[in-house]
């Protein structure tokens, strides 16, 4: 039995809430837990023996993923190929699948894994596949529970408790439906493309009848969740099942959400024994990832839940906790970075503080209330920012190429 896999990577006009981090690196390639966001997906898929072909589907330029694919191909020899399929326009989560259906199904593929790029998860794909085979399902989706307050931000489903059969699905409901949500990870039987074709034909009929007001070029747009899954779940003749994962899961939508995702990936790697031991005499509180090319002085204190990229320089007395430090950053003596993200080429002056507020990995919101105003919990510095000596930046979002000379709290610096 042969399976293929599709990772939906979107495009430059999607994922805008991830700015300013996506200004200098495409969101799917932003490093979390020491590796690119979609590397974690590939690592999980490589453990499924039947998966031979992996397709990245989106509308970025082909050059965006070229170097990444060339690099990771040698990491995953079990794959016959990892290929990027570029949409001619933004086709939606279902439109891209339908457009490239012949390539995805080539080679007598019986099952197709479909995964959104912007999810952080332990990826229990074998368990998902086992349920799919056991139930002889058309679709098996991974589900998890969230708080009632968070539920309306996701695709909510109602399932039959005794069997796990999905009875109803609504994407981002306007009123409370359920606190069981779709994780954005699916296994489809190959016959799903017949259902996607029907959904595509229904959409064309609606366009012809002018039931939808469409922007120019959106005629071929098809949502996997709204146009395909929702109608299927309401059809009692279709076998749609849910696998409820007890393990960690969260979306990576906003820039700040990368910090709790980083913590989850580092903790998993440390627990599994796959986290490389940092080659430094600095004080380390695990879990911590430090790139081998980074220079961390002996007097620094790093961790827990910190990722440090290549060519970073950290001086004596610096303190970093619950943060992501991207490539080529400089953190001067006695500076403090807490609950923050520093994009590439940032410089933090002596005795300065760049800090956010703590967020729980299970907390899906990355904003807090300050003086009755919603502000960023995680401080995010865009690329090439400079914070002068003895300056404090707290709960701020700073766009690239900014020079901070005075203290800031709860600001968006444009």
Swiss-Prot record:
It comes from the Eukaryota. InterPro entries: GMPPB_C, Mannose-1P_guanyltransferase, NTP_transferase_dom, Nucleotide-diphossugar_trans, Trimer_LpxA-like_sf. It catalyses: alpha-D-mannose 1-phosphate + GTP + H(+) = GDP-alpha-D-mannose + diphosphate. Keywords: Cytoplasm, GTP-binding, Nucleotide-binding, Nucleotidyltransferase, Nucleus, Transferase. GO terms for biological process: GDP-mannose biosynthetic process. Pathway: Nucleotide-sugar biosynthesis; GDP-alpha-D-mannose biosynthesis; GDP-alpha-D-mannose from alpha-D-mannose 1-phosphate (GTP route): step 1/1. It is an enzyme of class 2 (transferase). GO terms for molecular function: GTP binding; mannose-1-phosphate guanylyltransferase (GTP) activity. It holds the Pfam family NTP_transferase. It is found in: Cytoplasm; Nucleus. PANTHER family: SUGAR-1-PHOSPHATE GUANYL TRANSFERASE. Belongs to the transferase hexapeptide repeat family. Involved in cell wall synthesis where it is required for glycosylation. This is Probable mannose-1-phosphate guanyltransferase.
């Amino acid at each position: 039995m042969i399976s293929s896999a599709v990772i939906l990577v979107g495009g430059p006009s999607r994922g805008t809430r991830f700015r300013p981090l996506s200004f200098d690196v495409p969101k799917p390639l932003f490093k979390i837990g020491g590796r690119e966001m979609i590397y974690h997906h590939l690592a999980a898929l490589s453990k499924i023996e039947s998966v031979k072909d992996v397709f990245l589907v989106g509308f970025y330029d082909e050059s965006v993923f070229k170097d990444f694919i060339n690099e990771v191909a040698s990491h995953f020899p079990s794959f016959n190929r990892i290929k990027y399929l570029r949409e001619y326009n933004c086709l939606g989560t279902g439109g891209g699948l339908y457009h490239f259906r012949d390539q995805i199904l080539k080679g007598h593929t019986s099952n197709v894994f479909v995964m959104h790029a912007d999810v952080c998860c332990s990826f229990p794909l074998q368990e998902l596949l086992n349920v799919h085979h056991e139930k002889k399902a058309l679709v098996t989706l991974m589900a998890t529970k969230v708080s009632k307050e968070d539920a309306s931000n996701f695709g909510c489903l109602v399932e039959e408790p005794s069997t796990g059969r999905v009875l109803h699905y609504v994407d981002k409901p306007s009123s409370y439906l359920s606190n069981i949500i779709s994780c954005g990870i699916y296994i489809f039987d190959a016959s799903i493309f017949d259902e996607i074709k029907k959904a595509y034909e229904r959409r064309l009929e609606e366009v012809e009848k002018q039931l939808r007001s469409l922007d120019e070029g959106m005629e071929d747009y098809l949502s996997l969740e709204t146009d395909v899954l929702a109608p299927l779940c309401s059809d009692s003749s279709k076998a749609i099942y849910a696998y409820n994962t007890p393990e960690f899961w969260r979306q990576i939508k906003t820039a700040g959400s990368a910090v709790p995702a980083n913590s989850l990936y580092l903790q998993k790697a440390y627990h599994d024994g796959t986290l490389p031991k940092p080659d430094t005499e600095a004080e380390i509180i695990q879990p911590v990832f430090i790139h081998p090319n980074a220079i961390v002085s002996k007097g620094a204190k790093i961790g827990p839940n910190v990722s440090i990229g290549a060519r970073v320089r950290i001086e004596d007395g610096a303190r970093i906790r619950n943060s992501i430090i991207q490539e080529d950053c400089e953190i001067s003596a006695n500076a403090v970075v807490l609950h923050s993200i520093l994009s590439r080429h940032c410089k933090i002056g002596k005795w300065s503080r760049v800090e956010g507020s703590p967020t729980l990995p299970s907390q899906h919101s990355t904003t807090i209330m300050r003086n009755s105003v919603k502000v960023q919990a995680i401080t995010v510095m865009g690329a090439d920012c400079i914070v002068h000596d003895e300056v404090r930046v707290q709960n701020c979002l700073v766009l690239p190429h900014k020079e901070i000379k005075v203290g800031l709290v709860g600001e968006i610096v444009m």
